[in-house]
Amino acid sequence: MLLSPIEAQILSQYQLLAVQLNTLSSEVKQLNSTTNQNSRPSGKSSSSEDGVEATNSGSADKLLDNLRNLEMKIGLVYTLFKGAVYSLFLQYEEDQNLKNDEEQRRNDDSDEEPQNHHEIDAIEGENNDDMGDRMESQENHGH
């Protein structure tokens, strides 16, 4: 059975993750052993050395737990940040749409006003023509 390219890529990513986790685990063990060697007091019995080793091991485990908690919190902050940025983009787009709609309304209103003025001018022109015709007819009748 052959793997699709995406399946092969996913498996290689899992393999890389496993290698990194193994490396991290070995580094933590090395850190624990270095810490244990540096903190062992000389002249103590082996029973007290075991207690110090357990304490140092516990400190490293607490450190790892704290790092895991920090990683989860950073992930949550990142998710919230992405949501906030997305919200800002949506709000900006909505504001731009409202501005464009307002400009369109203004343009439509300004396009309608000259038409009304032309209609008024045309009506006034007809009235003026009628008055001019009346004046001419009165002058002609008057003479």
From Swiss-Prot:
Molecular function via GO: microtubule plus-end binding
Region of interest called Disordered, as start-end residue ranges on this chain: 32-62, 96-143
One Pfam family matching this protein: DASH_Dad3
Top-rank taxon, per record: Eukaryota
GO biological-process terms attached to the record:
attachment of spindle microtubules to kinetochore; cell division; mitotic sister chromatid biorientation; protein transport along microtubule to mitotic spindle pole body
Comp. bias (Basic and acidic residues)? 96-121, 131-143
Q: Cellular component GO terms, alphabetically?
A: cytoplasm; DASH complex; microtubule; mitotic spindle
Q: What is its main location?
A: nucleus
Q: Where is the composition biased (Polar residues)?
A: 32-59
Compartments it resides in: Nucleus; Cytoplasm, Cytoskeleton, Spindle; Chromosome, Centromere, Kinetochore
Indicate yes or no for the key word Nucleus: yes
Q: Which family does it belong to?
A: Belongs to the DASH complex DAD3 family.
What does the UniProt record say this protein does?
Answer: Component of the DASH complex that connects microtubules with kinetochores and couples microtubule depolymerisation to chromosome movement; it is involved in retrieving kinetochores to the spindle poles before their re-orientation on the spindle in early mitosis and allows microtubule depolymerization to pull chromosomes apart and resist detachment during anaphase.
Subunit comment for this entry? Component of the DASH complex consisting of ASK1, DAD1, DAD2, DAD3, DAD4, DAM1, DUO1, HSK3, SPC19 and SPC34, with a stoichiometry of one copy of each subunit per complex. Multiple DASH complexes oligomerize to form a ring that encircles spindle microtubules and organizes the rod-like NDC80 complexes of the outer kinetochore. DASH complex oligomerization strengthens microtubule attachments. On cytoplasmic microtubules, DASH complexes appear to form patches instead of rings.
PANTHER family named among the record's database cross-references: DASH COMPLEX SUBUNIT DAD3
- Output this protein's name: DASH complex subunit DAD3
Q: Which organism is it from?
A: Debaryomyces hansenii (strain ATCC 36239 / CBS 767 / BCRC 21394 / JCM 1990 / NBRC 0083 / IGC 2968) (Yeast)
